[in-house]
């Protein structure tokens, strides 16, 4: 959530930064500014009334004690004025409450401001490639798409998943299930070694949690809701892990806080009709290891770069070719101030596909979820900066392995770092 004080004091600057996101989208700050002005008028009236009420409370006993009002006319008038002040204060309270709710509702609809270092651009075509890694590991043979080789080997079963659920689900069979488990454990082990504390959070979460990290109210159609219980299926572990600290004041010495978490993730993919209808790239249910950081604002940028490196380290260990892309302002996610996408090479389609999105939200989520920290020896508190990224999406990693590690005989060579987990060197037909 944006800072209303920043909007009030620098409306032109905030408007200009919002406009960097999309020339086609009009983020009108006028209603917020008008409501904010009205709220401050009401607040000023309330303070004046409270001051006068306090004066009356002191004057009445003084008049009684001093005997300066033998007929009690002044005291009577003061009491009547006091009652009027009380009534006026009572009428102000619901007005202030209503306007505050309206302001918050409008603020929740506004995206984060792009970082000044985020490249300007209208859409994904103007994202900037930062680096590539692993060209020497590009396959030398023509390969089948991961869903074809997976079905041939009997480790991916899409047909019966449709029978059990619907499209965009998969059954992992035999070595497919084992490979999924191996990837989860390998990724968690590596990130724990890198200093992340593992969390296994609930995957059913409440509305307040989704609002805190920015998925609600903007993207309600993207998530699965259990309406009878007012709970949602988590779209990413970012939500429950970040909300562990909601309404908390953290001691400054505890920062940075680094968590890794494996969870199933659930997304309706409402806006992706017709996209990636085959394979593991875009499922309603998928597994993911997420990295979440709560950091000091002064170290935010450095911690973001380190987060990207931690995600890259998994792909390097697996020897999967990838590239890092910096998203331009027009392709930036709703809550992100700055974002890098890591894209893995999928040879069957001769393209790179996103496997991790590493975002710096600055204080956007912390302000929504009220996550603050206090530095020793300093007055007051500050909002933390939150960062997160996939470390990695398991299904997409599996799809990259099934394609990049295909052999001419139709088997899959198991990446060396996964062999201790799988207890095998090759995946053949089940």
UniProtKB/Swiss-Prot annotation:
User: Any one Gene Ontology biological process term?
Assistant: seryl-tRNA aminoacylation
Where is this gene product found?
Answer: Cytoplasm
Its UniProt entry gives the catalysed reaction(s) as:
tRNA(Ser) + L-serine + ATP = L-seryl-tRNA(Ser) + AMP + diphosphate + H(+); tRNA(Sec) + L-serine + ATP = L-seryl-tRNA(Sec) + AMP + diphosphate + H(+)
Q: Show the disulfide pairing.
A: none
- Keywords assigned: Aminoacyl-tRNA synthetase, ATP-binding, Cytoplasm, Ligase, Nucleotide-binding, Protein biosynthesis
Q: What top-tier enzyme class does this entry carry?
A: ligase
Cellular component terms (Gene Ontology): cytoplasm
Q: Which Pfam families match?
A: Seryl_tRNA_N (PF02403), tRNA-synt_2b (PF00587)
Question: In the record, what terms sit under GO molecular function?
Answer: ATP binding; serine-tRNA ligase activity
What pathway is this protein said to act in by its record?
Aminoacyl-tRNA biosynthesis; selenocysteinyl-tRNA(Sec) biosynthesis; L-seryl-tRNA(Sec) from L-serine and tRNA(Sec): step 1/1
Locate the residues binding L-serine: 236-238, 290, 390
EC numbers: 6.1.1.11
Q: Which family does it belong to?
A: Belongs to the class-II aminoacyl-tRNA synthetase family. Type-1 seryl-tRNA synthetase subfamily.
As for what it does, the entry says:
Catalyzes the attachment of serine to tRNA(Ser). Is also able to aminoacylate tRNA(Sec) with serine, to form the misacylated tRNA L-seryl-tRNA(Sec), which will be further converted into selenocysteinyl-tRNA(Sec).
Instruction: Please give the subunit comment from the record.
Output: Homodimer. The tRNA molecule binds across the dimer.
Q: What's the record's remark on domains? A: Consists of two distinct domains, a catalytic core and a N-terminal extension that is involved in tRNA binding.
This chain belongs to the protein called Serine--tRNA ligase
Q: Which organism is it from?
A: Gloeothece citriformis (strain PCC 7424) (Cyanothece sp. (strain PCC 7424))
